[in-house]
Design a protein with these regions (language model features):
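N-terminal glycine-rich anion-binding loop in soluble enzyme alpha/beta folds
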Residues: 2-60, 64-67
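C-terminal functional extensions of proteins
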Residues: 2-11, 16-24, 54, 275, ...
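Glycine-rich phosphate/diphosphate-binding loops that line cofactor/substrate pockets in enzymes
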Residues: 59-73, 209-213, 265-275
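Glycine-rich anion-binding loop/nest that anchors nucleotide
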Residues: 73-82, 102, 218-222, 247-325
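Short acidic, glycine/serine/threonine-rich loops at helix termini
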Residues: 85-89, 113-119, 229-233, 290-293, ...
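Short, solvent-exposed amphipathic alpha-helical segments in soluble enzyme
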Residues: 89-95, 233-237, 294-301, 328-332
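A generic, well-ordered mixed alpha/beta core segment in the N-terminal half of proteins
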Residues: 91-161
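Ligand-binding beta-strand-loop-alpha-helix segment within the catalytic cores
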Residues: 135-226
Length: 366
């Protein structure tokens, strides 16, 4: 770098420019990786240098250091990432105490269970973008529920679990009890009401790992899921209800307000001794819901000395323009008091299924 050229720039601009570091290794990439104690991490550090790859590496290294210093991580999961087997990585992070709370859409949460009970019944269609509307209708009529390149086996998953959950809801109504959606689901594991698919690996189920570690799960907007729709139909008492159909009191289910109360207590307790980072996989309500926690504690509960989010890292491909973006970018979050000027932030504009495995591998020391 020509330092004379740099010195002509304004002080603020000079701070933004970094010198190209010396080569990180000697010899070939293959030789370096083969001799490394953590080969995946070694390969990542040698090759993920610029743009989204560089942002992914820097984010992973920051999170690794954050954990080393006693920090904790909240992970949020959007879309249908559980169907796309992100749970393989997330489950291991939970087992290794790298993730301490998960916020997931109702769909992602239930799909983790569906993978557990019906893994061998899933099917794929790699060239899904070439399907015609008529072919989509064929798939519908055959009972094949498509999520981009993946078919969810409804009969072998949803319909297997529904009777068990229905009985739990009915029993709760009789006793006047109410629980969170994830608490009802966890009883499927605890009471051994479901079994893993013979061709599935139970260790790949992040919801099972969260159950074993007893870490909190938050499900904002539970109604926006297959089982949430089913619960809504059981609690509906309007004109469309058929005579003799099962009716359940909706009060057996705790709501998003209850989840927010849970997060209040969790964050205040955990942040006393640990900075907490926010890793957002995709966008939507799974992330927008918990990110509001800190400003709500500050401005609504009037606890102004609450610790800010230590860092915010988002992986997603939705741009902030044209109304398609959900939430706010890292800097914009500062204006809402969701982040401070000292919070680490990084936006990785890429596919979660491509980037998250690298971050997970580095955090796991692979």
């Amino acid at each position: 770098m020509d330092k004379k050229k740099i010195s002509k720039l304004s002080k603020g601009l000079q701070k933004l420019i970094l010198e190209e570091p010396n080569a990180k290794t000697t010899g070939t990439v293959s030789g370096h990786v083969k001799s490394a104690k953590t080969p995946v991490s070694a390969y990542a550090e040698r090759t993920l240098n610029h743009l989204n790859a560089g942002a992914a590496l820097q984010s992973a290294l920051w999170l690794k250091d954050h954990l080393k210093k006693g920090g904790k991580i909240v992970v949020t999961i959007a879309g249908a990432l559980s169907s796309f087997q992100v749970g393989v990585m997330l489950a291991e992070l939970i087992r290794k105490n790298k993730v301490h709370l998960v916020s997931a859409t109702g769909a992602n949460h239930e799909e983790s269970y569906y993978r557990y009970v019906a893994h061998s019944h899933y099917a794929y269609i790699p060239r899904y973008t070439e399907l015609t509307p008529e072919q989509e209708a064929e798939l519908r009529d055959a009972g094949l529920r498509r999520i981009t390149d993946t078919f969810l086996p409804e009969d072998e998953s949803v319909r297997i679990m529904e009777p068990h959950l229905l009985k739990m809801w009915q029993d709760a109504e009789k006793t006047g009890e109410k629980y969170f959606p994830h608490e009802y689901f966890r009883r499927l594991f605890k009471e051994k009401l479901i079994k893993p698919d013979p061709k599935a690996n139970p260790s790949d189920c992040w919801a099972y790992a969260a159950y074993e570690k007893d870490i909190p799960i938050v499900i904002p907007g539970f109604e926006d899921s297959t089982m949430g729709n089913i619960f809504a139909s059981y609690t509906y008492q309007g004109a469309l209800k058929n005579k003799g159909d099962t009716v359940i009191d909706s009060r057996v289910m705790k709501t998003g307000l209850d989840y927010f109360h849970l997060m209040y207590d969790w964050y205040i307790k955990e942040s006393k001794n640990s900075p907490i980072a926010f890793l957002q996989l995709g966008g939507g309500i799974a992330a927008d819901f918990p990110i509001c926690l800190v400003p709500s504690i500050k401005h609504d509960l009037k606890h102004h000395n609450v610790r800010d989010w230590a860092g915010f890292i988002e992986i997603g491909s939705s741009p902030m323009s044209y109304g398609s973006y959900s939430g706010a970018g890292g800097k914009e979050k500062i204006t809402w008091d969701k982040l401070s000027t000292k919070s680490y932030y990084q936006i990785i504009q890429s596919d979660v299924t491509v980037v998250f495995p690298w971050i997970a591998a580095i955090l796991l020391g692979l």
